[in-house]
Amino acid sequence: MLENECLEFAASSDEEVCGLIVGNESLVRCRNIHQDPRRHFRISDDDWLETEAAGEITAVFHSHPEQKLVLSGADRSGQLATGIDWWLASGGKLRKFRPVEHLLGRTFKHGVMDCYTLFRDAYHLCGIDLPDFERTNGWWLRGEDLYLKNMAANGFHGVNMQDVQLGDVFIRRAFPESDPCHAMIYLGDNTILHHENTGRLSRREPLRPAYLRLTHSIWRHEQCSSLDFRGVFDDISAKSL
C-alpha cells in the first residue's frame, strides 16, 4: 500500500525524507539536498524532471522527524508554488493536504472563496476535514440556516462565551435581520480569523464588540483536542513574510 510505503520511508531516517507521488500510485524516493535536512527538505531539479518524464506528479511527499503533522510555513509556500497535494508523515501517521490558498489576503467570491471556505481550509490545515456544501447567494435571507444545520451535522456542539478556546467558531449575523451566516475562527488573545463579504480581504483582527452583538452562537468540534493550530499560525507567518 502506497501510504504504508511512505510511512516506512519516513521511519528509515532521523532527517526529513522526501519523494514524489506519481499518478497517486507510486512513490519515487528522492534525495534531500537541503543544507539543514533535519528541519527542511529540497528535491533537486534533476529528480523532479526525471520523475516528471516518467509520469504525472500528483503529490509531493516528505516527513517531519519531530512530532508535527502539519505543514510548516516553508512547506505551505512550497506547496502553493507546486500547486499540488502534499503528503506529510510524522509520528507514524500520514496526512494529505490540499493546496489551499493562504488564509490571509483572500479575495471574496461567494461559494468559492468565502467565510466557509476559509473556515474549512483552516481546519484542513489543522487536521480536521470538513465537507463543502452547496450555497447560493442570499441564503441568509431565505431561512435556509445553512451554518446551523451543517455545524451540528458535522461534529460541532455549542459552547458558552466564558468557555471559549482556540479553534472555536463564532457564527454571527451579517446584520440584525439576517440569519446567522458568517463564521469567525477564534485564534486566542481576543483575535479572530474571518472573511467578510464587504470587499475586504480575509484577515485576522480583534474580536470587536460589534461582532459579539451580532453573534448567534459559538461552536466547538468534537475532535478539538486533535486540532493542531500550528498549521494555521505557520500559514499566517508564511503569508506575512
Predicted regions and their residues:
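Extended, compositionally biased flexible segments
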Residues: 56-65, 195, 200-202, 206-217
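Second-shell loop/turn segments in exported
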Residues: 104-109
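...with weaker cross-activation on analogous glycine-rich loops/strands in unrelated enzymes
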Residues: 136-202, 207
